Amino acid sequence: MAATGGRRCRRLEGETARAVLANVDTLLFDCDGVLWRGEAALSGAPAALGRLAAAGKRLCYVTNNSSRTRVAYTEKLRRLGFPPAEPRHVFGSAFCAARYLRQALPPGAAAYVLGGPALSAELEAAGIPHLGPGPAALPGPAPADWAQAPLEPAVRAVLVGFDEHFSYAKLCQALRYLLRGPDCLLVGTNRDNRLPLEGGSAIPGTGCLVKAVETAAEREALIVGKPSRYIFDCVASEFDIDPARTIMVGDRLDTDILMGNTCGLTTLLTLTGVSTLEEVRGHQESDCPARQGLVPDYYVDSIADLLPALED
C-alpha cells in the first residue's frame, strides 16, 4: 500500500509478524467482528488467542458494548473456546462508565440511566445509586404534565448507554435532570452510530441515543468508550502497561484504531468486521491529520492469520 508521507499500513505476516509479536507483552482485543460474530467464534480465533496466551502474552478485551457485564464476557469467551479470562481482563464501556462515575460523583450521588441490565449491574457493583433502566411512560397527556414528573434529588449524572426502551419519556427526564445545572454530568458509553448485523443489515447504536440527549440538552457528553483514551486508562490502571509493547486489535478504524493510535499503541486492523482496506487506503492517501489518525500500522484478513507466526 503506497503512502504519501503519513502513516503506512502493511499486512502483518511472515518474519514481520514474528518480530512484532516477539516485542509485545499485551494485546487488547475488540470482540464483535474480531473474535466472534454473534454467538459464533470466528474461524481460528480461539486457536490464535490460545497460542498467544501460551506464549505468555497478556490478553485483554476492550469493547464499546454496554449490554454485557465483565462477568458475562468471561462466560462468553469460555463458551466459545477462548482461553480462560478473569473479569479484570475485560474492559467494557458499562464497567468503565461506572468506574468514571465512582471517581467523579460525590458520595451518595445518584445517576439517571438510559441503559439496560448490564449497565445497571456494573453501577451496582461500583456502589452507585441509580434509576431509570426499563420502560418508562409519559406521566400525563400534555407537555405541562411531562415537565412536572418527579425528579430524584440525589441525581447528579445522566448516563446514556444502549437502551432498547429509549423513549420520549426518558429523553424528557434526562433533559430535566441536566437543566438543573452544569453540576449534573452527562456521560455516554460510546458514539457508535450503528450496530452491524449478519447479512449486511444494521440497527441504530448508542451514539444515536447520546446525540438525542446532547441535542436536547445543548451539551456535549463525556464519552468513556473508544476512541476516548479513558477506556485505555482503565486498562493501564489495572495492569502495568507499556504502550510501546502493546497492540490494539480491532475491526473499526474510527474507534479501535483511532484509540490505539491516540494512546501510542501498535494498531492492527482485522478485516472480519466493519472497516475495509479501501477505507484504509483512502485515509492513508489523505493529507488530513485527522484521517491519518485512522490508519492502522498493520492489517490481517483475520486473527487466524497470526497462527503461522506463533508456531514453535
UniProtKB/Swiss-Prot annotation:
Q: NCBIfam families in the record, alphabetically?
A: HAD-SF-IIA, PGP_euk
**GO cellular-component terms in the record?**
cytoplasm
The cofactors named for this UniProt entry are: Mg(2+)
Cofactor: record remark: Binds 1 Mg(2+) ion per subunit.
User: Origin organism of this chain?
Assistant: Gallus gallus (Chicken)
Quote any Pfam family the record assigns: Hydrolase_6
Q: What is its EC number?
A: 3.1.3.21, 3.1.3.48
Say if the entry is tagged with keyword Repeat. Answer: no
Q: What class of enzyme is it?
A: hydrolase
Family, similarity comment = Belongs to the HAD-like hydrolase superfamily. CbbY/CbbZ/Gph/YieH family.
Supply one GO BP term: glycerol biosynthetic process
Known partners and oligomeric status: Homodimer.
Q: Location of site Important for substrate specificity?
A: 195
**Protein name listed in UniProt:** Glycerol-3-phosphate phosphatase
GO MF annotation: an example: glycerol-1-phosphatase activity
Q: What are the alphabetically sorted keywords of the record?
A: Carbohydrate metabolism, Hydrolase, Magnesium, Metal-binding
Identify which residues the record assigns to the active site. 30, 32
The UniProt function text for this chain reads:
Glycerol-3-phosphate phosphatase hydrolyzing glycerol-3-phosphate into glycerol. Thereby, regulates the cellular levels of glycerol-3-phosphate a metabolic intermediate of glucose, lipid and energy metabolism. Was also shown to have a 2-phosphoglycolate phosphatase activity and a tyrosine-protein phosphatase activity. However, their physiological relevance is unclear. In vitro, also has a phosphatase activity toward ADP, ATP, GDP and GTP.
Q: Which reaction does it catalyse?
A: O-phospho-L-tyrosyl-[protein] + H2O = L-tyrosyl-[protein] + phosphate; sn-glycerol 1-phosphate + H2O = glycerol + phosphate; sn-glycerol 3-phosphate + H2O = glycerol + phosphate
**Protein residues bound to Mg(2+):** 30, 32, 251
